[in-house]
Amino acid sequence: MTQTLSQLENSGAFIERHIGPDAAQQQEMLNAVGAQSLNALTGQIVPKDIQLATPPQVGAPATEYAALAELKAIASRNKRFTSYIGMGYTAVQLPPVILRNMLENPGWYTAYTPYQPEVSQGRLEALLNFQQVTLDLTGLDMASASLLDEATAAAEAMAMAKRVSKLKNANRFFVASNVHPQTLDVVRTRAETFGFEVIVDDAQKVLDHQDVFGVLLQQVGTTGEIHDYTALISELKSRKIVVSVAADIMALVLLTAPGKQGADIVFGSAQRFGVPMGYGGPHAAFFAAKDEYKRSMPGRIIGVSKDAAGNTALRMAMQTREQHIRREKANSNICTSQVLLANIASLYAVYHGPVGLKRIANRIHRLTDILAAGLQQKGLKLRHAHYFDTLCVEVADKAGVLTRAEAAEINLRSDILNAVGITLDETTTRENVMQLFSVLLGDNHGLEIDTLDKDVAHDSRSIQPAMLRDDEILTHPVFNRYHSETEMMRYMHSLERKDLALNQAMIPLGSCTMKLNAAAEMIPITWTEFAELHPFCPPEQAEGYQQMIAQLADWLVKLTGYDAVCMQPNSGAQGEYAGLLAIRHYHESRNEGHRDICLIPASAHGTNPASAHMAGMQVVVVACDKNGNIDLTDLRAKAEQAGDNLSCIMVTYPSTHGVYEETIREVCEVVHQFGGQVYLDGANMNAQVGITSPGFIGADVSHLNLHKTFCIPHGGGGPGMGPIGVKAHLAPFVPGHSVVQIEGMLTRQGAVSAAPFGSASILPISWMYIRMMGAEGLKKASQVAILNANYIASRLQDAFPVLYTGRDGRVAHECILDIRPLKEETGISELDIAKRLIDYGFHAPTMSFPVAGTLMVEPTESESKVELDRFIDAMLAIRAEIDQVKAGVWPLEDNPLVNAPHIQSELVAEWAHPYSREVAVFPAGVADKYWPTVKRLDDVYGDRNLFCSCVPISEYQ
């Protein structure tokens, strides 16, 4: 039969590229699970009362090429002015070797958070380097492996200051008036829910205020002034006040380390170490503290440990501080941070080394000195005598200056009374400085760069002598070796080879949705039209961004069944926090601010109780029944007991047990009956899109993990994006921003992220995914995700019982394999199985969540039947190995499972095990071998002997 032109055009071609199993494979799997079609399967599994009659209308699919052309036309509406706005964001020069070999490399961007250290040694080493950069520049003892952005790092510093403060009755936090406005905005938001009073005043007046537990100072103020706070910090320390300092990472190359001046906590943005502005993100924040406060620090910390053979190995240390273990008692609700961006900054420091970084920092400062000298020579006054890269220039005709700047396609900072701000950066040239002279002085200024350079080179007083760094930085060999591109390329490749990412194998982590991050989706993030915009540029310069964001928001509204979407939260945890704040402020608007009880099922993600605590709520746990579902009787009892104090419930759907609960609408009705709101966690949205929706189910607010359902890659532990969808009554209460007016905001709420649209430059990834899939493809993706999970469950259930199922023994998009009976019978644990899977070339499923002693498997729709069968065969082979242990063929203390994973060096070492080398490293069915570089890590050793900076280079060899 002759095909039509429409068929030949094949606008839905990408759907077949994204979805792993082809039509024939899907039918084979449907036969295996006993279903006639995808529609029949989802019709059986998803409760009838929540199934959508028609898919959301998000348009027809488009080919990769058509979608890229469409988005390119949108991006071209952005105007790329040269921005000297500063305020924590500057233009950068990302070394091409890092751009090509990391940012554009799926071996780096498709990896997951390094919970399995044996398959993560490469990015753990890069993160350890990031921590070393932080330690050297801040002068402190302990560093984290990144936070979400500078403003949220400030909020975390405030929370940490309260945790460690010896002034238990003090409840006030002092913020110096020269911090960036977006930092103050986020600090105020967090302080409100913690019940802290924020005082904003000149730093020198801090001692006038009583009952202060912590102080936030900014080393280089928002308008550019360098402050020597040594004496003030000393006085504050004598009063037992915890001192936090916000610092500029490039300025720290030249300036005294705040830690040496006595600061307890130092943080800032690592953006200007090679990460494009991207209209606000994503960017990594650095965070450091004194050793005595290490167990109160937020976020990931990479530590040096030992493996089973005694070799040096890296791991995430002190995880007992974190939300997935401590829940509402966690130091922070942070789950994903900004690993990919921290690693870009880390490798930027490796590539340039201390000499290169000093050259860059000195060049920026020299050009700033030249600009200052020329302006002063012509009679203009600078507001500050001491500066690094930012001048605050007093101008009589400010309107005229700004008009000339606009004509020259230049952005100056314009919100300073009777002055303009000018921040230079590593991209600034002498030609740029001459152009700035013309903008500020007119074309006939008569100034020459070389003449001015001679003057300032001999007599620069713009940095106080006491503020000049007098110690060496980045002395570790890793920062002094890889300065040729050949060496750098090979170093990065050596790190990449140590890790297991989606470019090598399926990552079947339950609740993580490790699906394809298609090349076409990733291409736009490096377009200069998206990468080079300052987040605070005039809105008319960002019309392309505004169109793309509005279109994406409209699609998400339709897919979720909500009325509005807020794009600001830059992680799932941040989205939870923002959604709960919207609920809190909604209740307050109705004079029901006393509603502060949050009901959370026992099966919930650890971020849920941690976020509820951050939002100032009390957590009350709701029991689950023997089938893993929310116990309705207990829910009613807890809701009734809470009464007028009920704020909300946080529920995940499908449940974290991998089941579509039949009573989800009844759950919503019970909570609404008692005046509460329903927060539906979007972690499992990949099993809803096109089939049902949170709004249709009856929820009021959800966050969406764009880094799960909508294809933003996990980046080895970030970036993420967690926008929130809300019903109309909550729309006035989503986050706002103090610097940028967000279109459609009805009331002014506090910000939760530094930038108005969070990590805006990765939103094109989700835009591309939805545009290429269309309504038809999105629904099919959800259906195939469900099919793949049920196929795995059906083939493995005899070897590993599936713990929870819904009607007809079905699961949703993931399944929980119960290892507890096997462990009781044989002594082999879920940990042993997880590590043995590495020998078979797989990342382990999620261990012991949401139920201890289990493995949770989520294959996603992107994995083909071939890959699913490879995983299933590996699991069945492991089960056969367990049977060998059970039968006594191999002793419990010496077998391939408890000794896993096995590394190459074992092949040439003496072999005394009761199983062969071949069984160890080439078990059944393994052909394309992934080699871990370390054996199983000693977690206890790592936490007892905490060491979080670079080890001697010999340890890596």
Swiss-Prot record:
| EC class | oxidoreductase
Keyword entries, A-Z = Oxidoreductase, Pyridoxal phosphate
Q: Does the keyword Oxidoreductase apply?
A: yes
Q: Which reaction does it catalyse?
A: N(6)-[(R)-lipoyl]-L-lysyl-[glycine-cleavage complex H protein] + glycine + H(+) = N(6)-[(R)-S(8)-aminomethyldihydrolipoyl]-L-lysyl-[glycine-cleavage complex H protein] + CO2
Q: Which InterPro entries match?
A: GcvP, GDC-P_C, GDC-P_N, GDC_P, PyrdxlP-dep_Trfase, PyrdxlP-dep_Trfase_major, PyrdxlP-dep_Trfase_small
A GO biological process of this protein is:
glycine decarboxylation via glycine cleavage system
Q: Which cofactor does it need?
A: pyridoxal 5'-phosphate
Q: Does the keyword Oxidoreductase apply?
A: yes
Question: Entry's Pfam families?
Answer: GcvP2_C, GDC-P
Query: Which sequence positions carry the modification called N6-(pyridoxal phosphate)lysine?
Result: 708
- Enzyme Commission designation: 1.4.4.2
Entries under Gene3D superfamilies matching the protein:
Aspartate Aminotransferase, domain 1, Type I PLP-dependent aspartate aminotransferase-like (Major domain)
User: Care to name a GO molecular-function term for this sequence?
Assistant: glycine binding
**GO CC list:** cytosol; glycine cleavage complex
CDD domains xrefs: GDC-P
Please give the function described in this protein's UniProt entry. Answer: The glycine cleavage system catalyzes the degradation of glycine. The P protein binds the alpha-amino group of glycine through its pyridoxal phosphate cofactor; CO(2) is released and the remaining methylamine moiety is then transferred to the lipoamide cofactor of the H protein.
What family does this belong to?
Belongs to the GcvP family.
Q: How does it assemble?
A: The glycine cleavage system is composed of four proteins: P, T, L and H.
Cross-referenced NCBIfam families: gcvP, PRK04366.1
Query: Entry's PANTHER family?
Result: GLYCINE DEHYDROGENASE (DECARBOXYLATING), GLYCINE DEHYDROGENASE, DECARBOXYLATING
Please state what the protein is called. Glycine dehydrogenase (decarboxylating)
**Organism, as annotated:** Shigella flexneri
The gene designation is gcvP
